[in-house]
Amino acid sequence: MTDSPEIPYLLRAAKGEILPRPPVWMMRQAGRYMQIYRELRDKYPSFRERSENADLAIEISLQPWRAFQPDGVIMFSDILTPLAGIGIPFDIIESKGPIIDSPIRTQAQVDQLNPLDPDQSLPFIKTILKTLRQEVGNKSTVLGFVGAPWTLAAYAVEGKGSKSYSVIKGMAFSEPSVLHQFLDKLADMIATYVRYQIDCGAQVVQMFDSWAGQLTPQDYDVFALPYQQKVVRLVKETHPDTPLILYISGSAGVLERMGKSGVDIISVDWTVDLAEARQRLGKAMMVQGNIDPGVLFGSQSFIRERIIDTIRKAGNQGHILNLGHGVLVGTPEDNVRFFFETAKQFSYQD
């Protein structure tokens, strides 16, 4: 039953099929906790090269697949990748994160942005996704991903990651029309990019609105939700059958609002009890998550307990097992292996 030759397991779950166990993958399952990744990073120190050189990105995406056989293989990339294609150059500095030398602060800058032409500015994405589909066949589901409008705007306006988001909040609360026009353009760009990823082979796409949890619920309703909805609406017009996931870090205060975005699956962070999340979202909404990444530093017996507890709280359908955030640097690889083995041995019948 778990080896349907036509449709991979995670995709079956994402389309609502009732299965013997939840599918499992991890956010940031390719990355710095893996020694094989660190060796490749030492050889190719530029993050943009690792994520935009198709051969390197394919190799990195497949490292956790070869090691652990997760039910989902997500392409190795970054949420900022499409920005250069609309006229916002950026770099990603190891240990510092993204840097945008000319942050978007004025109406004139917003007016100068151009529409995204992925074939022209992101041709490596096609190679990455097509190759991943060929490599994993129907043994795993290939996931694409994008940033959501508010989060991409936060990076582009701040010029880097931020703890306070004072620059973009200053724009939101003093020049909202400039920010709304920017968010609208970003929503168009992201929808184009999601469609492109699906056309290139992505079977499920996750949208990260990582910084929307920094908004009050009333500001979320104005600056985040309408633009998430626009992305989803545009994608569903052309690709109605591709499941879409929404993830927000620190989402406890806006969980019900996430459910109004139009996505098929809500990825829940670890600060919310999953049984409570299902109650708040309604049984019809599928969920993903939501184990604390710190659990993977614990004993294997504790990891097993937490996996079983999380699956039981989620109920026996409409759940994809994942962490509530990305895998942390320094996580023991053996514990990641144990996590996947334990999750895949689980049965709702037991």
From Swiss-Prot:
UniProt catalytic activity: uroporphyrinogen III + 4 H(+) = coproporphyrinogen III + 4 CO2
Give binding positions for substrate. 28-32, 78, 155, 210, 325
Which Gene Ontology MF annotations are present? uroporphyrinogen decarboxylase activity
Transition state stabilizer, annotated site positions: 78
User: Keyword rRNA-binding, does the record have it?
Assistant: no
Pathway(s) of this molecule: Porphyrin-containing compound metabolism; protoporphyrin-IX biosynthesis; coproporphyrinogen-III from 5-aminolevulinate: step 4/4
Q: Where does the protein end up?
A: Cytoplasm
Instruction: Kindly name one Pfam family recorded for this protein.
Output: URO-D
> Quick one: where is this thing mainly located?
cytoplasm
Q: Which GO terms describe its cellular component?
A: cytoplasm
- Keywords assigned by UniProt, alphabetized: Cytoplasm, Decarboxylase, Lyase, Porphyrin biosynthesis
The stretch of residues making up the signal peptide is none
How does the annotation summarize its subunit structure?
Homodimer.
Q: Which family does it belong to?
A: Belongs to the uroporphyrinogen decarboxylase family.
- Protein's name according to its UniProt entry: Uroporphyrinogen decarboxylase
Name the gene for this chain: hemE
